[in-house]
Amino acid sequence: MKFKDSALAHEILDNSDVIIEIGASAHNPFNIKSESYFNVDLPKKYREVYEQESEVLGEGIATVDVEVTGVDLPFPDNYADAIMSSHVIEHFFNPIKALREWYRVIKPGGYIYIICPHKDRTFDKGREVTTISEIIERLDIPYLEDGAQHYTVWRTDDFVKMVKAFGFVVTHVQDVDDKVGNGFTVVIQKQHGI
């Protein structure tokens, strides 16, 4: 079962030189046209749950080019035109640390393209929304993410408020993402260093 392509992702990102996707999946590829495309994902021992799910969905397992967590990327500053993720940011205990790292790696004018599960359209429905104050408390807590659970839960407006509170510039928002439909899309553009 493959999901449709995102028209918004193609509009913004097609023909980029370098794209990095955090946590790509074979059953839900973005199919963006670029010169270089890297899939960054957790080391193999942490990917077992996702690989089993991909096998069940019948599309095989996405090839991983770089095995690291998404908070410590082995790319130089201003390297990529875009970093993309779909249903990944909620797995970070400290999502701002991840976003700051992704921001470091993208070029000025580049994009961070995020699809995140919407609290009311996923199994997170019964959970409380993660507040900005909770995120602030997590900033200095060292924690090794195992990637298997949702540490954060948002609705579209909560996520947008959070990223803006930390100085990120949001250029595009879809309350219902145009790829899977159970999340929302937020696109951040690099204007200057944070």
Predicted segment positions?
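Short conserved loop adjoining the S-adenosyl-L-methionine
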Residues: D72-D77, R104
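Hydrophobic beta-strand segment of the Class I
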Residues: I83-M84
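Short conserved AdoMet
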Residues: D14, F93, K107
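Class I SAM-dependent methyltransferase SAM/SAH-binding core
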Residues: V18-D72
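Hydrophobic adenine-recognition pocket in adenosine-nucleotide-binding enzymes
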Residues: V88-I89, H118
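S-adenosyl-L-methionine-dependent methyltransferase catalytic module, highlighting the catalytic core
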Residues: L57-G60, E67, I96-E101, K107-G193
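Conserved alpha-helix/loop element of class I SAM-dependent methyltransferases that forms part
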Residues: M1-S16
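Nucleotide donor/acceptor-binding cores
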Residues: S16-V18, N78
